[in-house]
Amino acid sequence: MRSVLSLALLAANVVTAAVVSPFDYSGYKVIRVPTQKDNVKEVQRIITDLNLDTWKYPKSEGQNADIVVPPSQITSFMERISGMSMEMMHEDLGMSISNETSFEAYSAGYAPDINWFKSYHSYQDHISYLQDLQGLFRTRSEYVDAGKSHEGRTIPALHIWGSGGKNSKPAIIFHGTIHAREWITTMVTEYLAWSLLSQYNKNADITSIVDNFDIWVFPIVNPDGFAFTQTSNRLWRKNRQPNPNARCPGRDLNRNYPYQWVGPGSSSNPCSDTYRGAQPGDGTEIKVHIANMKRIASYHGIAMFVDWHSYGQLFMSPYGYSCTARPPTDARHQELSRIFAQALRAVHGTPYRTGPICNTIYQVNGDSVDYALEVLKVKLSLTAELRDTGARGFVLPADQIVPSGEETLAGTVAMLKAVIRG
């Protein structure tokens, strides 16, 4: 990582470090174009003709197109969308990234507190933080090296338990950062872990949750991709595993799970952001996570799995692979999704939509939620798209971390209380 450290120490025992990405997004714009029946095909053509990247691709009418436009294409793009509604998400994406990646470097050994959540952080600082956080609560938690990524990085996990000791209750599993550029998910899953540990025996609801479940938090499911977003390209999505006979590396790990692997919700093109891989479950990190989930399930089963993503402000249930099929537990999934969204909104007024993945966001093949439910027989399998709805998208300012954590914790606590009640 290339970084520049300030000379002044801050009050929270941190220093400011500006991380510069070799891919320069200066002058790039991110523009939202809402689609409807009379323009969706034209918007799709514009994206194809100008070879533009998208944060959100409009697969059907009514969906927003969030489009990344390089300086060389701005004039042509604006001419092509003349007469259409549009919203500027990032006037200068390079400037937005520069502001977001002014990290506060963590001092190893520093007692973790709310200050951690005032900034985004490097991969290695996340490892130090998780180890230090666990060190404060040694009798009811453990830091786990859950396995290695394709490039040999640790996939970290925190294991949290209450009365009865570890591996004595049904498990809750939280996944974050399976998509590398979704930095807010790293911070929010760590906020959940910090809250569950620090508020145990202080907050009755959190104490009850920790006493009723064995909790596993995996904040960085895709460490190679995450590190790559900090050193090379902030908007990278996939892992970094090479693809034989292809110039583009990486698999979309959330299209690589070995269940309903082939379909319109994934791609066979190695250069696509939704490339499913050469074989079901051939992603190095997916092999690690499947092995971990099977091991965790072998104790007392898995009560709930939640895969945290961004962006869109959605809380969703199975299925991703089909827009018509519903699991037998659909009503319960929908009930818990509504409980989560209502409790979350009560904190800062942030609205979330709920519903099955395929109907709420888009069709997805080979995803974690469907795999967990149907193959691992997890009782409740859910996924979230955290803040925001597109004003900033993947490049979410650091001042959104704490409110995102606060509201997500409230939604999660309310949902798990409902699970305990039955």
Curated annotation (Swiss-Prot):
<keyword id="KW-0862">Zinc</keyword>
<keyword id="KW-0732">Signal</keyword>
<keyword id="KW-0482">Metalloprotease</keyword>
<feature type="active site" description="Proton donor/acceptor">
    <location>
        <position position="385"/>
    </location>
</feature>
<dbReference type="GO" id="GO:0004181">
    <property type="term" value="F:metallocarboxypeptidase activity"/>
</dbReference>
<feature type="binding site">
    <location>
        <position position="237"/>
    </location>
    <ligand>
        <name>substrate</name>
    </ligand>
</feature>
<feature type="binding site">
    <location>
        <position position="309"/>
    </location>
    <ligand>
        <name>Zn(2+)</name>
    </ligand>
</feature>
<feature type="propeptide" description="Activation peptide">
    <location>
        <begin position="18"/>
        <end position="112"/>
    </location>
</feature>
<dbReference type="GO" id="GO:0005576">
    <property type="term" value="C:extracellular region"/>
</dbReference>
<dbReference type="InterPro" id="IPR036990">
    <property type="entry name" value="M14A-like_propep"/>
</dbReference>
<dbReference type="InterPro" id="IPR000834">
    <property type="entry name" value="Peptidase_M14"/>
</dbReference>
<keyword id="KW-0121">Carboxypeptidase</keyword>
<feature type="binding site">
    <location>
        <begin position="254"/>
        <end position="255"/>
    </location>
    <ligand>
        <name>substrate</name>
    </ligand>
</feature>
<keyword id="KW-0964">Secreted</keyword>
<keyword id="KW-0843">Virulence</keyword>
<comment type="similarity">
    <text>Belongs to the peptidase M14 family.</text>
</comment>
<protein>
    <recommendedName>
        <fullName>Metallocarboxypeptidase A</fullName>
        <ecNumber>3.4.17.-</ecNumber>
    </recommendedName>
</protein>
<feature type="binding site">
    <location>
        <position position="179"/>
    </location>
    <ligand>
        <name>Zn(2+)</name>
    </ligand>
</feature>
<keyword id="KW-0479">Metal-binding</keyword>
<keyword id="KW-1015">Disulfide bond</keyword>
<feature type="domain" description="Peptidase M14">
    <location>
        <begin position="119"/>
        <end position="419"/>
    </location>
</feature>
<feature type="disulfide bond">
    <location>
        <begin position="248"/>
        <end position="271"/>
    </location>
</feature>
<keyword id="KW-0378">Hydrolase</keyword>
<keyword id="KW-0865">Zymogen</keyword>
<feature type="binding site">
    <location>
        <begin position="179"/>
        <end position="182"/>
    </location>
    <ligand>
        <name>substrate</name>
    </ligand>
</feature>
<dbReference type="Pfam" id="PF02244">
    <property type="entry name" value="Propep_M14"/>
</dbReference>
<comment type="function">
    <text>Extracellular metalloprotease that contributes to pathogenicity.</text>
</comment>
<dbReference type="InterPro" id="IPR003146">
    <property type="entry name" value="M14A_act_pep"/>
</dbReference>
<keyword id="KW-0645">Protease</keyword>
<feature type="binding site">
    <location>
        <begin position="310"/>
        <end position="311"/>
    </location>
    <ligand>
        <name>substrate</name>
    </ligand>
</feature>
<feature type="binding site">
    <location>
        <position position="182"/>
    </location>
    <ligand>
        <name>Zn(2+)</name>
    </ligand>
</feature>
<feature type="signal peptide">
    <location>
        <begin position="1"/>
        <end position="17"/>
    </location>
</feature>
<dbReference type="Pfam" id="PF00246">
    <property type="entry name" value="Peptidase_M14"/>
</dbReference>
<dbReference type="GO" id="GO:0006508">
    <property type="term" value="P:proteolysis"/>
</dbReference>
<dbReference type="GO" id="GO:0008270">
    <property type="term" value="F:zinc ion binding"/>
</dbReference>
